[in-house]
């Protein structure tokens, strides 16, 4: 049987999904900062936002006032800089206004996602990070079904230390098992608070729930990312935090997580 890989993904080396069981856990923040960190390591990176009803990636990457252009092979992603090593695609670029709401039924959403996966000309890139909506819905099933022939490297599951968020991650793990998507690991976001004055990290919430869940479910634990007010400010400005806050515990955590992801994906390649 002939295996057909979507045209836009034929030169993509590694595909990683970013999932969360519920909203508000910082999934898009993790997706953007992982993309920046991979970029800063010298990789060519694509960031695809398929959260159709809440497209926050364009603003977080400081590219929201750009337009998507067409080429002979499809859509050209919006690049963050002239080196064209970090490209972004989101429905946010296709809306007339930032205030426009996407009020679509499932079939239209699914068709849009299929078009994103097949018609975006990513070119020869090392990583494609796919930021998904929270939960498990039609959008997730559409993504997984259309990526089957690409054999994605796996999914990163984002949670916070609270019990409610952690219990929702269990459903994400079950979803990955049912759809045969490997789990690259769990990231515990908002784990501790970094003082903006002394950079000391204090556990204002509970801590360690993500790591305990990873052990229980026998999936890798990638690390904890603390709350850092400076990181929040940089995200609001659409900046790569790792260039500006090299001594931040949050930067150290993200870089450590990226190292683990790079190691896992390189093993998949071999």
Swiss-Prot record:
InterPro entries: Mrp-like_CS, Mrp/NBP35_ATP-bd, NUBP2/Cfd1_eukaryotes, P-loop_NTPase, YlxH/NBP35. [4Fe-4S] cluster binds at residues 195, 198. The keyword DNA repair does not apply. It is found in: Cytoplasm. Its cofactor is [4Fe-4S] cluster. Binds 4 [4Fe-4S] clusters per heterotetramer. Contains two stable clusters in the N-termini of NUBP1 and two labile, bridging clusters between subunits of the NUBP1-NUBP2 heterotetramer. SUPFAM superfamilies: P-loop containing nucleoside triphosphate hydrolases (SSF52540). GO terms for cellular component: cytosol. The keyword Calcium does not apply. ATP binds at residues 21-28. GO terms for molecular function: 4 iron, 4 sulfur cluster binding; ATP binding; ATP-dependent FeS chaperone activity; iron-sulfur cluster binding; metal ion binding. This is Cytosolic Fe-S cluster assembly factor NUBP2 homolog.
């Amino acid at each position: 049987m002939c295996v057909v890989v979507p045209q836009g993904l034929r030169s993509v080396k590694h595909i990683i999904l970013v999932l969360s069981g519920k909203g508000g856990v910082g999934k898009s923040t993790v997706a953007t900062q992982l993309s920046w960190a991979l970029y800063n390591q010298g990789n060519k990176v694509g960031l695809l936002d398929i959260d159709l009803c809440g497209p926050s990636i364009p603003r977080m990457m400081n590219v929201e006032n750009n337009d998507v252009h067409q080429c002979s092979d499809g859509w050209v992603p919006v690049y963050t800089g002239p080196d064209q090593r970090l490209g972004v695609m989101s429905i946010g670029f296709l809306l007339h206004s930032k205030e426009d709401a996407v009020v679509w039924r499932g079939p239209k959403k699914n068709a849009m996602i299929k078009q994103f996966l097949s018609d975006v000309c990513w070119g020869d890139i090392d990583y494609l990070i796919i930021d998904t909506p929270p939960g498990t819905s039609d959008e997730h099933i559409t993504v997984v079904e259309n990526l089957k022939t690409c054999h994605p490297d796996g999914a990163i599951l984002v949670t916070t230390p609270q019990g409610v968020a952690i219990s929702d991650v269990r459903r994400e793990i079950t979803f990955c098992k049912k759809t045969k998507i490997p789990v690259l690991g769990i990231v515990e976001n908002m784990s501790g608070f970094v003082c903006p004055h002394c950079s000391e990290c204090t556990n204002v919430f509970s801590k360690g729930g993500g790591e305990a869940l990873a052990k229980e479910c026998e999936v890798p634990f990638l690390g904890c990312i603390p709350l850092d007010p400076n990181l929040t400010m940089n995200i609001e400005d659409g900046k790569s935090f790792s260039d500006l806050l090299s001594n931040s515990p949050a930067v150290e955590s993200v870089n450590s997580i990226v190292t683990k992801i790079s190691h896992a994906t390189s093993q998949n390649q071999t």
